[in-house]
Amino acid sequence: MTYHPELAPRRRSWLIATPLMFVIVLGIAWSGFWYWAAGQAETRINDWQAQQASAGRVFICGKQTLGGYPFRIEARCTDVSVEVKDSRTPVALKLKEILVVSQVWDPKLFIAEFTGPLMASDPGEEPYATATWTLAQASVRGTPNQPDRASIVAEGLKLVDAAGQPLFDAKHSEFHARVQFGSWPNNPAIDLAANLKAASGPGLSPYARDPLDADILAVLHGMKDFVVKPLPVLLREWQERGGRFEIQSARIAQGETLATATGALSLTQAGRLDGALQLNVIGLEKLLPAIAQQKGVALSLERAAPALNAIDRAVPGLGARLAPQAQSISAGLLGLLGKPVDVEGKRGVSVPVRFSDGNASFGPIPVGQVPAAF
């Protein structure tokens, strides 16, 4: 049989070309969409910077770039400087770099990574505090009108003063916030969680010199927006809405001392702290001397004498056996003012900590006035 090429079946080249053309068109369309989304992101960043500047908070990037094609949008800001002028004490902040990433298919989730150091100073002056870390990341899900949750995690966080003296450090620290489902915006309630590992604050408090671990679960009621404002203004608005900070569970362990607490705190119209905490402690006798050394918190037997005298009248002879002039404040509190309680299988002491219009008391002992928040 003679072969005739013209009689051979023709290949359907369009079957090959059509998928290829579809991929090319899809790639062009996706590229156009990505560049449009990147442009929108840059516009939102610029608008946000202008809005903050009008409110007295100036954010400046030494260099700002956008990238992440094809599936992410990355906004990178290097040589960051922030000047906050709307607070009682203006502050200037400097940070090496911020990288914010969002997936194109999930634009409500933002992940940020911070590169230190972070330096704080008075405007135009040398830094008075510097923070460093090995890793610092944050994530935010939601929109300003419908927030969902936010988290921040830091590893190897260290804070020092101008002389290089340590103020605070933590091997691991993380904070989480989540809006309770259905509570926003009419009756907002925000679940809070904090975790610290090997944290110490020698420059912040005398009883935070030794490393401690902390786990805290709480609920913040009454926070209706997340607009950045001066802290006094934010707290005043929170108080006017009947805001309340509910501590569901707090656990702090430091050496042989262990403390757990529950309770609720709020602010009065004058901005003073109000509420009560139930504190359960193992090793209270080790905690009290450090508290007594803190400036402005004078835990002394002279201040405890009225309470001890009242107990002596109720139980004649008990005060004589534990006379103030013969016993320390620790022994007096443990023997007379503390209520025995089981704390994680060990014997401890339960003491109420009360705040009434800013006046703080440890059990029946007044310990001073907490400054007004606004």
Spans of model-derived segments:
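Loop-centered beta-sheet repeat module
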Residues: 2-6, 20-23, 156-219
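Extended terminal
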Residues: 2-20, 62-63, 234-240, 250-252, ...
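Hydrophobic membrane-insertion alpha-helices, especially the h-region
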Residues: 17-34
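Alpha-helical transmembrane signal-anchor/signal-peptide segments
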Residues: 36-53
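N-terminal beta-strand/beta-hairpin edge segment
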Residues: 54-185, 250, 261, 283
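Extended lipid/amphipathic-ligand handling interfaces
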Residues: 64-66, 95-105, 131-145, 170-185, ...
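Outer-envelope beta-barrel architecture signal
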Residues: 73, 188-190, 271-273
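Flexible, membrane-facing loop/turn or short amphipathic-helix motifs
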Residues: 81-90, 118-129, 156-169, 179, ...
